[in-house]
């Protein structure tokens, strides 16, 4: 399975939007990241998002940019910010037949999921930037021996998209 992990884009402050949806800059950053993924030939069998507005928006924008049906986005509590990595990985393991899955998620869980997939414990300190994306390949789940194929920052994705 190819697992793609993306932190949501920059969001509005709670005073401006109680649901902390994406800011205009955040929306543009995610559109750019999505265009880069499309240009790289990446598509998905499934996209998972948390129930938080900024995660749902990130998932929807990426879906739009890569040609994935937004109606097929799976909203789940199992990719929220404080979800233990074992729970998120279990959700992935329960998706037989899927080979390319994007999680549009939050910190700290994205970093913890990446670490869980790559090493035992939380030894791999994978850092995420809002709108950045990484790809980890796994043969089976759960595993601690995934392969980090790449991590691209928002700036690198912007260069690819242009």
Please tell me what each predicted stretch does.
Residues 2-79, 83-86, 90, 124-130, ...:
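Active-site-proximal alpha-helix that buttresses catalytic centers in soluble enzyme cores
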Residues 12, 82, 110, 142, ...:
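Flexible, glycine-rich phosphate/dinucleotide-binding loops
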Residues 36, 61, 65, 94, ...:
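Active-site catalytic microenvironments for nucleophilic, acid-base chemistry
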Residues 68-70, 98, 143:
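Short, well-ordered coil/turn elements that cap or connect secondary structure elements
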Residues 91-102, 146-154:
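A polyampholytic, Gly/Pro-enriched intrinsically disordered region
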Residues 94, 98-102, 107-132:
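Non-DNA-binding regulatory cores of transcription-related proteins
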Residues 118-147, 153-154:
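Domain-level recognition of soluble alpha/beta enzyme cores
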Residues 154-162:
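Acidic, His/Gly-rich catalytic cores of divalent-metal-dependent hydrolytic chemistry
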């Amino acid at each position: 399975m190819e697992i793609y992990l993306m932190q949501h884009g920059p969001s509005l402050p709670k005073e401006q939007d109680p649901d902390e949806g994406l800011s205009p800059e955040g929306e543009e950053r995610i559109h750019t990241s999505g265009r880069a993924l499309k240009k790289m030939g990446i598509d998905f069998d499934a996209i998972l998002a948390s129930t938080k507005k900024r995660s749902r928006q990130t998932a929807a924008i990426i879906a739009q940019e890569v040609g994935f049906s937004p109606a097929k986005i799976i909203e789940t509590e199992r990719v929220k910010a404080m979800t233990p990595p074992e729970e998120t990985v279990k959700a992935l393991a329960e998706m037989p037949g899927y080979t390319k899955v994007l999680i549009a998620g939050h910190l700290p869980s994205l970093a913890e999921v990446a670490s869980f997939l790559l090493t035992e414990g939380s030894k791999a300190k994978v850092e995420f930037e809002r709108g950045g994306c990484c790809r980890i390949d796994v043969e089976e789940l759960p595993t601690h021996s995934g392969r980090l194929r790449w991590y691209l920052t928002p700036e690198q994705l912007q260069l690819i998209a242009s």
